[in-house]
């Protein structure tokens, strides 16, 4: 399936403030593609989410996060499952600020020149995890192409501080690709490897130029393969979105590539456009197709596959890890 609503254009020459956090149209105005909306597809009946309410832990979690000056990808990326996850007392923590150095047009995380790293963040994160008595946490980050190590050292500090205060808590990290710094980053991560190493491929290679400008499909596969070679006992994990214009066979081919690179855990979920400025949804995948992807995943040898319309990379990550034997 082609993507006719994504066309080339020259970068915007409008003045902008690189220090400000840019979202939606402001964020995407300077990438070398223009996102044009075609027909807006009606959401099918199987797309349903729960909103947080005052009777859940939703606001309690938000207050604790603000108190410790922390961000969650749940909030920054406008995850549709935020109500359910916050209500269950779980969250995916996003470290190194809330401004990403990339401008992926599917993602709702803000772009801008990042602030200096907060030296207190690792301890604040550890205190928050301890206060919430979390048994399984996911730590992710914005891309930090401005840092010589891509932020890997900060990941290590967060893991170490968390294990000091919560030694029984299992830690999954969802990392950027450490573009051009992968060997350095992997060497640094040796000091405190996580319990699960996650890096998302996001989409099929044909759509990388539109959906993941600045990223490389093979580079991402190799990052996980190299990590697995260094830490054979640590499960590796990756995730895909469907609905950007890919075909079912392209998804299956990516799954085969994942297994060929030693990736053991898989997530596949429906892409939902955060705004009209983002890449449009080209199709809503039927539950039967998700079921087919799941069945094929286990045939290929994945230890665990979380596949469904509302599945996200860190959605029920604890249950995914435990089902995979972590």
Curated annotation (Swiss-Prot):
One of its GO terms (cellular component) is cytoplasm. The keyword Metal-binding applies. Residues 85-303 form the Radical SAM core domain. Its EC number is 2.8.1.8. GO terms for molecular function: 4 iron, 4 sulfur cluster binding; lipoate synthase activity; metal ion binding. [4Fe-4S] cluster 2 binds at residues 100, 104, 107. It catalyses: [[Fe-S] cluster scaffold protein carrying a second [4Fe-4S](2+) cluster] + N(6)-octanoyl-L-lysyl-[protein] + 2 oxidized [2Fe-2S]-[ferredoxin] + 2 S-adenosyl-L-methionine + 4 H(+) = [[Fe-S] cluster scaffold protein] + N(6)-[(R)-dihydrolipoyl]-L-lysyl-[protein] + 4 Fe(3+) + 2 hydrogen sulfide + 2 5'-deoxyadenosine + 2 L-methionine + 2 reduced [2Fe-2S]-[ferredoxin]. [4Fe-4S] cluster 1 binds at residues 74, 79, 85, 314. SUPFAM superfamilies: Radical SAM enzymes. Its cofactor is [4Fe-4S] cluster. The keyword Cytoplasm applies. Pathway: Protein modification; protein lipoylation via endogenous pathway; protein N(6)-(lipoyl)lysine from octanoyl-[acyl-carrier-protein]: step 2/2. Binds 2 [4Fe-4S] clusters per subunit. One cluster is coordinated with 3 cysteines and an exchangeable S-adenosyl-L-methionine. Keywords: 4Fe-4S, Cytoplasm, Iron, Iron-sulfur, Metal-binding, S-adenosyl-L-methionine, Transferase. It is found in: Cytoplasm. Belongs to the radical SAM superfamily. Lipoyl synthase family. This is Lipoyl synthase. It comes from Acidovorax ebreus (strain TPSY). The lineage of its organism: Bacteria, Pseudomonadati, Pseudomonadota, Betaproteobacteria, Burkholderiales.
